[in-house]
Amino acid sequence: MRFFKFSTSFLLTILSTVLLVLQSCSPNNVTLQNNYKKYFDDAALTGSFGLFDNGSGEFYIYNLAQFKDSSYAPASTFEIVNALVGIETGRIVDEKMMLSVDSAGPIRMDSAFKQTSVPYFMEVARRIGKDTMQQWLDSLQYGSKQMGTAVDSFWLNNTLTVRPDEQLGLVKKLYFGQLPFQKRSQEMVKMLMLQTANANYKMSYKTGLNYKQNGNAVVWIIGWIEENKHPYFFVLQTEGAASSDIKNASMSLLNKILKEQGFFEGKR
């Protein structure tokens, strides 16, 4: 298996670069966006938001303490890592690979990713196996790196947790092909994350929804928006009373923030 061929020096290099986004974050290049509280309040949500302008090196952050210090289960945003490991190890052949995982019948990998088919990626994780998955979590230094005993649910049951700033580092490295996976693996997952493409912008993201022990719902939206071939990376994490509309409310909140930042018109 290709993973075991990594040299120690290569793994150390990857380890040292995973935190580049955070290490470059200093008081001089962070703008605190406290005015975004109005959008969270209007949606009856709490949480944090971070935007990184790759061109200028500037961060725009709402609720900095929570953004860099609070951890949550990644929920279905972990499908980014799950897909990367699956492709890299050959457990996922390509985006057309079909699996029958529930009564709905066979589903393709690309559709499973777009539609957030939890059963599909639970099966992928089982095929990858606990030891191999753990080795990749360690190599990526992804979140708490904890799996527990269940290889097919650790990203859903709060065993594995991750901070918003770590999620930002993940999508940034994916965009630039800087994760310890082959180019093919990263390009395939990047393609799957594309949600909107028009003359003004391209927007790529993955969502996740999970529930805390207190009954509250936690939503993630992580990815990037491109205007004039320039990428901006974002992470939104929200929390609120569980409802069928919380994911839509979080997406609306994200769009309002991005619009205030001047996106969607192709002028950035």
Question: Each predicted region: which residue ranges?
Answer:
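Structured C-terminal helix/loop/strand segments within mature extracytoplasmic catalytic/sensor domains
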Residues: 26-39, 43, 126-129, 175-200, ...
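Solvent-exposed coil/turn segments that connect beta secondary-structure elements
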Residues: 54-56, 67, 89-91, 142, ...
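Active-site SXXK
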Residues: 71-94, 112, 234
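Bacterial Sec-dependent N-terminal signal peptides
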Residues: 1-32
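Beta-lactamase-like hydrolase cores
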Residues: 25-68
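Mid-domain, small-residue-enriched loop/turn segments at the edges of structured enzyme/sensor domains
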Residues: 123-176
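Second-shell loop/turn segments in exported
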Residues: 66-73, 97-111, 118-126, 151-159, ...
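Short, well-structured active-site flanking segments
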Residues: 87-103, 181-185
